[in-house]
Amino acid sequence: MPDRHGRRHLAGVVLDLRGNPGGLLNEAINTASVFLDGGVVVTFERRGAQPLRLDASAGGDTRTPLAVLVDGGTASAAEVGTGALQDRNRAVVGGSQTFGKGSVQEPKVLSDGSAIEFTVGSYLTPAGRSLDGVG
């Protein structure tokens, strides 16, 4: 709808993350930053280390209504971003249960050139929820 000056504004945004297997954690934080004004997006917990809190950048749009669509193909970083927007009461989340990958893996290259991944930590949403195995 145009405002009184004739400018058009978004009535709302639908962020469709169905079938999104995740990707880079930084991109999840960048995406959440578009809709948040700073504050925690995710906490990374690693055995034997202090938890690392990762925050959104300041200045995101906190007013435009936001809905996030998810399904069983929504995983990893896509779940992290969704969890942040949900826990921070910034978005309505709809669809079906997500994949439930809230663990962090690091690869170790073996002497024969192959690699194996080890789980080294987990992600927690701003409310302290683990998504691992839950979605």
Predicted regions span which residues?
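A short, well-ordered alpha-helical element
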Residues: 1-11
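Short, glycine-/small-residue-enriched flexible loop/hinge segments at domain edges that mediate gating
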Residues: 10-23
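Gly/Ser/Thr-rich loop/hinge elements
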Residues: 20-76, 103-108, 124
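Short, well-structured beta-strand/strand-turn elements
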Residues: 88-101
